[in-house]
UniProtKB/Swiss-Prot annotation:
It comes from the Bacteria. The active site is at D50 (nucleophile). Formation of pseudouridine at positions 38, 39 and 40 in the anticodon stem and loop of transfer RNAs. This is tRNA pseudouridine synthase A. InterPro entries: PsdUridine_synth_cat_dom_sf (IPR020103), PsdUridine_synth_TruA (IPR001406), PsdUridine_synth_TruA_a/b_dom (IPR020097), PsdUridine_synth_TruA_C (IPR020095), TruA/RsuA/RluB/E/F_N (IPR020094). NCBIfam families: hisT_truA. It comes from Campylobacter jejuni subsp. jejuni serotype O:6 (strain 81116 / NCTC 11828). The keyword Electron transport does not apply. Homodimer.
Amino acid sequence: MKIKIIFSYDGSAFLGSATQPHKKGVQDALSGALSHLGIFSPLLMASRTDKGVHASYAVASVECGDYFTNLEYLQKQLNKFSHPFIHIKKIEKVKDDFEVRFDVKSREYRYIFSHASYSPFMASYVHFYPKFDLGKANELLGFFVGKKDLKFFCKSGGDNKTTLREIFIARAYAYKDFSIFHFKANGFLRGQIRLSVASVLKVLEGKMSEKELKEQIEAKKQYNHFLAPPNGLYLSRICY
């Protein structure tokens, strides 16, 4: 029996979501929790995130045999071995031909800025940043929407066959003392969102022009090579 695991994780506790040489990845921790329950099949992840990036909604799949017919019980037991940095939100039975990565229709991320006074207790979970013009940020993010060749918004080391992506949503909104950038696309390149966020901030700071941002989005020239910090970024939705 193949199952789909929907879960969240605190990225500050891991070196990234993928398996790591010293077993410090989210995939390693969740595989270890499954092994305590006698499930040793390879765990497959729908998305990869870098060190320090969080997920409020991540998805994985694994073959678990026919022993665990009570999925609510499996969820409860798996949480015992996954806490405190991973929380299993739901487990569903899926078809044998379900592909957790390649069946994805869209992914969503949110980047969270806090405009409150700095707190070391929140430093791993938001990017502390002065207030900015949210309307202007929305305008700049709108440049990303559509089918784009985002080769200048990609870190090296990815396994992508193409740098073409379709961005469905790129917007900014406010919530209490936070400003949030929301991205939805059919897929993302490695480092794409953090490069996008940093580029928008550069324009807001007057260190880069709108024309330069547009040229980078149009794959004409790269003006910004820097990434926004990982701690403000959250994988927030995966749709099939």
